[in-house]
Amino acid sequence: MEEIKALYVDLNKLRNIGIMAHIDAGKTTTTERILYFTGRKHQIGSVDDGTATMDWMVQEKERGITITSAATTCLWKEHRINIIDTPGHVDFTIEVERSLRVLDGAVAVFDATAGVEPQSETVWRQADKYNVPRIAFMNKMDKTGADFEMAVQTMVERLGAHPIPVQLPMGAESDFAGVIDLIEMKAIRWLNPEGTEMVVEEIPTQWKDKADEAREDMIEKIAEVDDEIMEMYLEGEEPSIEQIHAALRRITIAGLGTPVFCGSAKMNLGIQPLLDGIVRYLPSPLDLPPVKGFDKAGNEIQVQPTENAPFVAYAFKIQTDPYVGKLTFLRVYSGKLEKGSYVINTTKGVKERVSRLIFLHADKREDVEYVRAGDIVGVIGMKSTITGDTVCEENTYVILEKMEFPEPVISIAIEPETKDDETKLSKALQSLLDEDPSLRAYVDQETGETILSGMGELHLEIIVDRLKREFNVNVRVGKPQVAYRETITKDVKIEGKYIRQSGGRGQYGHVVVQFEPLGLDKTFEFVDKTVGGVIPKQYIPAIEEGIREAMQVGVLAGYPVVGIKATLLDGSYHEVDSSEMAFKIAASMAFKEAMEKGNPVLLEPIMKVEVTTPEDYMGNIIADLNSRRAHIDALENRGHLRVVKALVPLSEMFGYATTLRSLSQGRANYTMVLSHYEKVPEKVAEKILKG
């Protein structure tokens, strides 16, 4: 029990952090070492041999990349650190967004041989969007090609960041011997391979000049963004160690700069100073502005991070745990929650029971009696709550801002192999859909096949893999299909009438709707401009719903419709015969006619592709991209490599990984994220529509 008691710390000693990085920068290894040095893990796990604690799903162990954000808690110098492990592969940026939503701070891990890589840019921009304060760790300082100054410079060039190195590496590659702490002006070395014996000593003579110069540079960089240090700097005063720490904390929390540490997680070098940095510079829940929420009337309210306020929490992740069933991860923003109590899911308007509360350490669990503001906890017992929902104590009503999930861009048809698989499939899919809002599933009415849509080939591969492993459902998988969309290109005004009279009560719905193109970055907007009660208010939501439902199937080839603004102008109703259903049908009839008359076109997803390659292969790679209808955006140098940035239709990118490997003898790699949708060229559209 001692261990659990120790987990309850004052709120100012709590750090909720994420570790974010590019796929191979060493994020999982860094997390592992943090758990090792904070005493929560006694044998060091390694991704290379598949024993890392955070990567607890079997697929992750095999692929060596982190997929699911597991939440882990550990202790360091009387502080408690909750770590949300974030994935580093571009197909999982949704997971990253979801975890950033509930973090207070983050450690950005970079590979010192490569600096900022494409996926790091994506993740960094997401962290900017959620205003997450960050410190940085230049990892792999012992690797051939490690170059600390170059790596820091890439943070300026590619991220527009304001990095402030607080350490200087002593040597690099195989000569990497330790770090110089530029604040205390001491050298730190590690004496044993486990990294547990750390010595702090005077800076070796050969490093003295470089350290003085680096410290001067650090003070200047702090002064640029901190008034207090700037004043001292201008007056020639030397700030004290405490003043530097305080300034770095202010700068980090305000998002004005990023303290940079360095080391090698794999070799156990530099982890303790990084932990000190997490505690010193990253915010506690008290350092951040209160979270915004909305009351019943839609007025904005602030949720204060205090134990005495009513309980409010946000569900940021659902996992189906092999041992305990459905686990709902909550970030508690205010108040206190005891196990066995009831809460209200305000998003859905349902009551939920909290059977057990669990602190997680990757796949180990500790039951606790209660949780408080600031905590991250796994809850057992919630039935209806899914990702993005708000839960509150009874008699309290708050809804926190919802997360927006991107539209899927790729689909596959799956077919159960046996009758037994068929019966298990829908339950298994429901579990996966609860966990992952970026996954969609529906049954194709014409073919009867189940269609899965997701963020990329890897995303869907892993879902199919999980169906097999976790739910024991074997499926046959069709070829990946592009998630095309349809839209209109001109304004149309349509009347939709649904009238049925056949003895007894009839049906009557009548609407006049103006449909217009809205721009392809938006899905749908509905405006009610009726006046004088021509259609009673209670039927308006049914009209919107009728259009929304009809938008699932377009007229060209049955693809979902996007980019539509529908303005309800007029209509009429019948005292007896009108019903929600009648108006819903009238609205969907109007929409179908609008699609036919509004010059419908087919849209395709255009992907932002970045290929990183040695110079020798660049010509062939560009030629190949051009043959895929690519629009080459930019060519850049990145160290000794070249980067090709291009916009390419997703339909041309299937199997690209294999082609790229053969074009570059396996030396080039690429990342791909959705950029936007655009009209399919006519010749290509003809082929698609012919099927």
Swiss-Prot record:
Residues 12-286 form the tr-type G domain. It comes from the Bacteria. GO terms for biological process: ribosome disassembly. Keywords: Cytoplasm, Elongation factor, GTP-binding, Nucleotide-binding, Protein biosynthesis. GO terms for cellular component: cytoplasm. PANTHER family: RIBOSOME-RELEASING FACTOR 2, MITOCHONDRIAL (PTHR43261:SF1), TRANSLATION ELONGATION FACTOR G-RELATED (PTHR43261). HAMAP family: EF_G_EF_2_B (MF_00054_B). This is Elongation factor G. It comes from Fervidobacterium nodosum (strain ATCC 35602 / DSM 5306 / Rt17-B1). The lineage of its organism: Bacteria, Thermotogati, Thermotogota, Thermotogae, Thermotogales.
